[in-house]
Regions:
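Hydrophobic, small-residue-rich transmembrane alpha-helices and their short perimembrane loops
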Residues: 1-77
Length: 77
């Protein structure tokens, strides 16, 4: 049974994109859970924790977006 290489590339890109999204979501989820725990322990540091959480979440989103771009580029090549 012959397999089209383009179809396999799209399939691999879909799997890569899915794993990327799941990894980013898991990372941001763990980040938010740790931030909420930190705020619960020290309510006075809520502003600092929130700022660090937003910055870290943005960095995770950036890496996730970059990885999605790479998977799309690999699929259309």
């Amino acid at each position: 049974m012959p397999t089209d290489p383009k179809a396999l590339a799209y399939f691999a890109a879909g799997i890569g994109a899915g794993l990327t999204i799941m990894g980013g979501a898991a990372g941001i989820g763990r980040l938010a859970a740790a931030a909420m725990e930190g705020i619960a322990r020290q309510p006075n540091a809520a502003g600092d924790i929130r700022g660090a959480m937003i910055l870290s979440a943005a960095l995770i989103e950036g890496v996730t977006f970059f990885s999605l771009i790479v998977t799309i580029l690999l699929a259309i090549k």
